[in-house]
Amino acid sequence: MEKVPMTTAGFETLKEELRWRQQQERPRIIEAISEARAHGDLSENAEYHAAKEAQSYNEGRINELEDYIARAEVIDVSRLSGNQIKFGATVKLLNEDTEEKKVYQIVGDQEADVKIGKISISSPIARALIGKEEGDVIEVNAPGGAHNYEIIKIQYI
């Protein structure tokens, strides 16, 4: 069974979503199915079909969450240190083309959200950063072309 790296915060978020889906969403959907059944003929009952579809999605997501949680390799980023970039690092970069500064934390696939600065360990930019140090310059091939970034700061917070 392949381990899935994730931060402590990411692990807690997955556990909370699992709890919500099992304890709140599942009973709500069961109630919706029951109500829709009470309306009679199921073959043309849109409410029933929508509730069954929601149930299928919810149960699939529960199975997925249980799998990720079972395979989680939880890494407490606050206990990490070092000069090289590894999983969990928060990295400040300077785009050498635009002079724009960006801050990213390298996280597990399930917790990645680029809008809040969390990039997946398997993303092209994270793969280019792993093992590098402050002052190094990396080249990232993105859909819009290649970009050069200078690593300004590495933190484990």
Curated annotation (Swiss-Prot):
PROSITE patterns named among the record's database cross-references:
GREAB_1, GREAB_2
Q: Which SUPFAM superfamilies match?
A: FKBP-like (SSF54534), GreA transcript cleavage protein, N-terminal domain (SSF46557)
UniProt KW DNA-binding keyword:
yes
- Which domain of life does the UniProt lineage start with? Bacteria
Question: Could you tell me the Gene Ontology terms of the biological process aspect for this record?
Answer: DNA-templated transcription elongation; regulation of DNA-templated transcription elongation
Gene Ontology molecular function terms on file: DNA binding; RNA polymerase binding
Does this UniProt record's set of keywords contain DNA-binding? yes
Identify the Pfam families for this entry: GreA_GreB, GreA_GreB_N
Which key words tag this protein in UniProt?
DNA-binding, Transcription, Transcription regulation
Show the NCBIfam families listed in the entry: greA, PRK00226.1-2, PRK00226.1-4, PRK00226.1-5
| Function as written in the Swiss-Prot or TrEMBL entry | Necessary for efficient RNA polymerase transcription elongation past template-encoded arresting sites. The arresting sites in DNA have the property of trapping a certain fraction of elongating RNA polymerases that pass through, resulting in locked ternary complexes. Cleavage of the nascent transcript by cleavage factors such as GreA or GreB allows the resumption of elongation from the new 3'terminus. GreA releases sequences of 2 to 3 nucleotides.
Q: What family is it from?
A: Belongs to the GreA/GreB family.
What protein name applies here?
Transcription elongation factor GreA
Question: Which organism does this sequence originate in?
Answer: Bartonella bacilliformis (strain ATCC 35685 / KC583 / Herrer 020/F12,63)
The organism that produces this protein has a lineage beginning with: Bacteria, Pseudomonadati, Pseudomonadota, Alphaproteobacteria, Hyphomicrobiales
